[in-house]
Amino acid sequence: MIESIASLSVAGLRERLAGFSVQAIDADDRQRAAVALALTETGHGADLAGMPAFPEWNTAPALLLTRRALTLRQHAGQWAMPGGRLDNGESPEQAALREMSEEVGLSLDSGSVLGRLDDYATRSGFVITPVVVWAGAARDLVANPGEVASIHRIALTEFLRDDAPILNQVRGAAHPVLRMPVGNAWIAAPTAAFIYQFREWILLGRPTRVAHFDQPVFAWK
């Protein structure tokens, strides 16, 4: 377990991730995608109901999350991490960094990559690789309006809540749907699955797999 969230460091996270045994999933006829699980600073807060705002810049560690643009054909308005399909010849790391630059205007080099978490196969036909990235303060983010409705800095302590995760059975699913509460709302898998595994294995030192958790029905297409 990392002794204090406030004491998170690049070296410490890189070491913890180096000891993580990643479970990869063969894509078969599915499309490869990657997301950036980007660690940044809380800044002025998450800009969400039920979460505090800070008049002065807060350097406590946070995750960088987005809400997808309402104009998108798939998964409009859903919580997400910067990410998308791999271009021909790209690695998941390259794709995650490219998508972060395109979606939120944050350009980082390969040295910011700390490691990977487990792949997750979605019902919509993707195998997603989460790439953990150290984003620094990331003070000048700009949402690409064609892809991102809003950008949020969610303090890591929010994901340590006692009521997380939320597990529910739904008809037609063999395994529970996993959600993570945030403020007065919640985030669904696959994004919630990546957050939960990062919390359990990397922050708390509890080996946890998440690929079996299902998504809510609205995310099946």
Task: Locate the predicted segments by residue.
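N-terminal leader/linker segments that precede catalytic domains of diphosphate-processing enzymes
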Residues: 1-80, 85-102, 106-139, 148, ...
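NUDIX/MutT-family hydrolases
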Residues: 143-181
